[in-house]
């Protein structure tokens, strides 16, 4: 076993949809590494089939305010409402951005991105169902991963695939790096950095019943919790898809 040191301006832990998108945003501004215990296109984002919701209004009248209303209502009014507003406003540009990067969305006869109804989405604040979910056949999440990963590769992002993060290094209250285990060799890698982003996904597989991938074991939140870093809303986790009333 060897101990290998690396130096990067920033490190992202996790290479699902969130981690890859964060890498695209950060890569032009810093020397960046993405550490992932899976090959990026195997991440659980690929399990999402139904679509990505955005008020494009390609099929019928729609706007982001109605999307925000549905999102807050769907959270039993517990969601951070300013964050919901940002999500629903920026979802429109995010879908168009993915289209420009090459995501093969399904299309309407007029060539626009196809949209379909999906649970809980309405127009006029609950009056009738909305055509809001933008989709790529039945493999939307898979195509999102492929598109984001291709974009990262084209930008020269450095990936460390099949590396299990073990710990973070904190000195004087400041994160100084990440310690990871290379699965193929058993070598320990120390990543010295001044910025770390955790995008390790959910933790449904700590429960007996879950449709989450077997890789979703809560490694990231567990590491942070052990270091005394506060976690937010850990009681809200997605156990199954489709969503069920009883498990």
Q: What spans do the regions from the language model cover?
A:
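N-terminal Rossmann-like FAD-binding beta1-loop-alpha1 element of flavoenzymes
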Residues: 10-33
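Conserved redox-cofactor binding core of oxidoreductases
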Residues: 99-187, 192, 199
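Glycine-rich FAD pyrophosphate-binding loop
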Residues: 28-47
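Conserved small/polar residues in nucleotide/adenosyl-binding loops
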Residues: 237-243
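Glycine-rich active-site loop/strand segments that organize a redox cofactor
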Residues: 54-86
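Short beta-strand to alpha-helix junction loop
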Residues: 83-89, 133-147, 211-215
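Residue-level detector of alpha-helix initiation sites
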Residues: 12, 16-17, 39, 139, ...
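Extreme N-terminal leader/targeting segments of oxidoreductases
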Residues: 1-10
């Amino acid at each position: 076993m060897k101990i290998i040191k690396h130096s990067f301006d920033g490190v992202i832990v996790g290479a699902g949809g969130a981690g890859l998108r964060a890498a695209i945003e950060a890569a032009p501004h810093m020397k960046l590494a993405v550490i992932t215990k899976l090959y990026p296109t195997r991440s659980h984002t690929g399990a999402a089939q139904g679509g990505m919701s955005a008020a494009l209004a390609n099929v019928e009248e729609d706007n982001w305010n109605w999307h925000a209303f549905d999102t807050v209502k769907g959270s039993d009014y517990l969601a951070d409402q300013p964050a919901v507003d940002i999500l629903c406003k920026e979802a429109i540009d995010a879908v168009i951005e993915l289209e420009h990067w090459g995501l093969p969305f399904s299309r309407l006869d007029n060539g626009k991105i196809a949209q379909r109804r999906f649970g809980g989405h309405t127009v006029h604040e609950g009056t009738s169902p909305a055509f809001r979910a933008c989709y790529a056949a039945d493999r939307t999440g898979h195509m999102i991963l492929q598109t984001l990963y291709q974009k990262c590769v084209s930008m020269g992002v450095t990936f460390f695939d099949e590396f299990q993060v073990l710990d973070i290094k904190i000195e004087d209250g400041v994160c100084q790096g990440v310690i990871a285990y290379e699965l193929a060799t058993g070598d320990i890698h120390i990543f010295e950095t001044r910025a770390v982003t955790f995008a390790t996904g959910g933790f449904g597989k700590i429960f007996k019943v879950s449709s989450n991938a077997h890789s979703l074991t809560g490694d990231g939140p567990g590491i942070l919790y052990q270091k005394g870093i506060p976690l937010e809303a850990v009681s809200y986790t997605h156990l199954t898809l489709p969503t069920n009333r009883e498990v």
